[in-house]
Amino acid sequence: KILFLLLITVLVPLTAQVTYFTNVSDKQIKTLQVKVAGEMFSDPFIELGGENRIEVNFDAFNPGFGRYAYNLVHCNADWTQSNLSPIEYMNGFQGSTIEDFANAMGTTVQYTNYRLLFPNDDVQPKVSGNYALQVYNEDDPSQIVFTACFSIFEPMVSVAATVSGNTDIDTNQSHQQVSFAINNKNFPITYPQTDLKIWVYQNN
């Protein structure tokens, strides 16, 4: 099995906050996908300033045509809202609209497919980290129809990792153990126990 290792610098919130996660709150929104554009199955991680983009794709089963807009929220490592203001983490303006859409043809149920690529001409991220894209009906900004979460990473350290079936639990059975070393020569980490959060993801 291939494992994906993700390290994110911790930004500690001052107060308890809402934790963001990908979810749909409007029953008219179906088949929400959040992935790397051009890849069939992928975790929504892209490099800051890289060539890849995040694709958010969904179907809206509205009786009539609906226009959707979105806001971008920068999050801490625990997916609570960070203390950064929009001008600090993005170029562009909140409330941009989703302009890529197409009505379904030849189907028994009428719906509209919407597609958003990020970054785009309207909004670009300035910093790495976790992001929550909140989409709402343009006529009612207070009602979020869904939230799409993704991460933008910045390769500031190098990581050497190994995977072994010889673990503290068992040997070559149902568990795996990951060991890794971080080369942070050009990125000082004063308190690694508290300054870093580490996640290990299984790839597919």
Mark where each language-model region is:
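Contiguous beta-strand segments within globular domains
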Residues: D26-H74, D170-N184
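Ligand-binding face of N-terminal immunoglobulin V-set domains in extracellular IgSF glycoproteins
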Residues: Q110-E138
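Beta-strand-rich interaction surfaces with strong enrichment in secreted/lumenal proteins
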Residues: P44-F45, D100-T107, D122, C149
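Low-complexity, Pro/Ser/Thr- and charge-rich linker/hinge segments at domain boundaries
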Residues: I152-H175
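Short acidic/polar inter-strand loop motif in beta-rich domains
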Residues: A77-W79, V123, N137-V145
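Bacterial Sec-dependent N-terminal signal peptides
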Residues: K1-T19
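Extended low-complexity, serine/threonine- and proline-enriched intrinsically disordered segments
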Residues: G64-G92, Y191-N204
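Extended, solvent-exposed segments with strong compositional bias
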Residues: M90-Y111
